[in-house]
């Protein structure tokens, strides 16, 4: 059963790799809120800098986490997923538990010791603590705005009557 | 699990980063695998959030190999005043 799942996922991952080359195809699938690639494991190659350079740019926001957005397998990863959900961000997620070479690869890439790791516009932003702090300070809304993502929280804020904005 | 406790981590951060305020909480019920920290030091002045966290991570590089989960809130003294005021 597991093997079947893996081979299915592998296929979707390879399709995705094709997407990167084709670039424009992602625009035709707006119904998918967040894309998730569990089958990084299938490649079996060591994840080097060149590969990660590409991976972190497959979407405006890319998250390396434990588990997947539907079922995070770590409290810190879950916190990042919930923050992204609140802001209504569409992002690509990679499960490092599926692939030890990705887990180590991304840590080496950023020189950052822990998972989750969040990238915006290809730039490493931080882990859970930093995302949480950016969320609380409002900086996350600004960072998202820079890459053309309008946070759902900002939309909600703007829809509010003037007297409630002070909160 | 790990040989570290909050006191050890506080002392190390105080010494290495010249903290004005530091508070480390053991959230692992004593097994030493999970900590959260509030760190306030002028060493953070002029640094971005990411740089602050990197500074703490590198200070505790050796310890973090054994500590499973470490959560930090890192502020400059100025930022800390604002946080306290809230």
What are these model-predicted stretches?
Chain B
Residues 13-22, 64-67:
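Short secondary-structure junctions
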Residues 1-4:
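N-terminal presequence-like segments and adjacent domain-start helices
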Residues 38-51:
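A short interface-forming secondary-structure element
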Residues 25, 38-40, 73-75:
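Solvent-exposed beta-strand sheet faces enriched in polar/charged residues
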Residues 29-31, 49, 64:
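A generic structural micro-feature
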Residues 9, 13, 49-62:
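Short, non-transmembrane amphipathic alpha-helical segments
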Residues 19-36:
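Short edge beta-strands and adjacent turn/loop segments
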Residues 58-86:
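C-terminal structural segments of small proteins and small subunits
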